[in-house]
Amino acid sequence: MEGKVDVLLTWLKKSDKFYIAPNISICESPETGRGIVLSHGSIRKNDIIVSVPSSKQLNFHTILYHISKFNKELNIPGITIDRKPINYEDNIIEAENKAWADPRYGLYSELSKEFLLSLSSFQLVSFYILVENFLLPKWTHNEIYSDWKPFFDVWPSMEELRSIPAIWNCDPNSRYHSLIEYLPAASRKHMARISGLVREDWETISEVVLKWNEIYGSLSCTKNSDKFTSDELFSLFVHVYFIINSRCLYAKIPLKIEDSPSNFTLVPYVDFMNHICESDLHCYPQLSPQLRSEGENIIGIGQFTIRCGDHLYDNINEELFLNYGAHSNDFLLNEYGFVVDGNKWNYLDISDEIIELIDDDKKEVKTFLLEHDYWGDYTINETDISYRIFVALNYYVTRDERRVRKFIEGYISEDYFKPKISSVLKELLVSLTAKYTKTLSELTEKVSNLENNLCLQNLITIYKGYIKILTQHLQDLQS
């Protein structure tokens, strides 16, 4: 990996707008993967750690710019290549002379402005990476590579992303599909949501990808070779999707400003930085939209800079972290494939258990809770049992509509209902503790039989966190 990082830095330094602090380096370990560490000296508040020019980022705007190099009909003012320079006609002639050797001239020219703008960022970025990183080398027998190859080459392999549950669910080649049954409710719901997005995005772009895969051998600029199968293409797409999902950073994309999930960019070198659950203490991002020029060209969305926050880095080999925020281990596992021991933002989603308990034959409880918008979304965190759980159990146990309504409105405190529901609540928490302890025991037994057990260890960490939360609340009920 060290050699690939050197190539990446050489590529980035071709722009005089790239900056990297002289006292940081990449560190790699089996436990934590790659990260950025302090090599000497110190880094203080507001110091620049790394600053990446607009032209070296991958996002909706830069991809349209690069596609327009091969598609002379694609013209979006301020986004695509400027067609006005004096030497533009010469560039067109030069491009046409190269077209016989590079399939992108023919294929990207098929993409209409309307089609490209209809895509979300995830769809366009994943489509572009799939073509540039995987299809182009195969089409040309590794004779033509993307300009982005130095960036592509430092991305994680599918095996390195193996701990993300949606990959277990989506990738036909995943060896971890059997672990889905051990996912807790919150993770299972998150996995299902992401899996749906993956399949939806693939459905949107697959027609073009599959068509190109079929015709590439007939193009004069490609050499005969085995095509990818549809399963192989989908597996590659899943790989690309989770590279994007695990590395994208929030940034405003003017063409997609109304579509919140599309507002992101991929930033080389910055994506080596790991996240930490502490808020507003470590490093933070800064986007400068006014800094978009690269020579005579205007490219992308602006300079992306990482600066040091309040934390002083002055210990050699200390890892530099990006501020992350309040995310539970279920969220972290499903979005990024890792968990954090002792994560204070953990919570349990016990909606299924509560609904199973209170959903009576006459649907009386459900009707009342639906009318008052308290049906579902029942959670417990380290310090609190959610108000929604109290509302649900209060009505389930007492069926006292008048008093429960007053409780909802804040006129009656929890103290009135607590003695009435404590036995039911305690029984529920004891049952959950036993359930999670049993699952934890099964997972622990599985771990001892495997060499590579990262996926299992992550699940074990989640269940240990659950049991810790339940134990704390059971102690509170008994005190």
Swiss-Prot record:
Cysteine pairs bridged by disulfides in the record:
none
Report TM segments.
Answer: none
Source superkingdom? Eukaryota
Record-annotated SET domain positions: 22-325
Which residues of this UniProt protein bind S-adenosyl-L-methionine? Answer: 324
Q: Which GO terms describe its molecular function?
A: histone H3K36 methyltransferase activity; histone H3K4 methyltransferase activity; protein-lysine N-methyltransferase activity; transcription coactivator activity
Name the InterPro entries for this protein. SET_dom (IPR001214), SET_dom_sf (IPR046341), SET_MeTrfase (IPR016852), SETD3_SETD6_MTase (IPR050600), SETD4_SET (IPR044429)
Q: Does the keyword Calcium apply?
A: no
Recorded E.C. number(s)? 2.1.1.-
PROSITE patterns per the UniProt record, alphabetical: SET
Q: Which SUPFAM superfamilies match?
A: SET domain
Single GO biological process annotation from the record: positive regulation of transcription by RNA polymerase II
Q: Which residues form a coiled coil?
A: none
Q: What does this protein do?
A: S-adenosyl-L-methionine-dependent protein-lysine N-methyltransferase that trimethylates 60S ribosomal protein L12 (RPL12A and RPL12B) at 'Lys-4' and 'Lys-11'.
Q: What family does the database annotate? A: Belongs to the class V-like SAM-binding methyltransferase superfamily. RKM2 family.
Q: What is this protein called?
A: Ribosomal lysine N-methyltransferase 2
Q: Which species is this UniProt entry from?
A: Saccharomyces cerevisiae (strain ATCC 204508 / S288c)
Q: What is the lineage of its organism?
A: Eukaryota, Fungi, Dikarya, Ascomycota, Saccharomycotina
What gene name does this entry carry?
RKM2
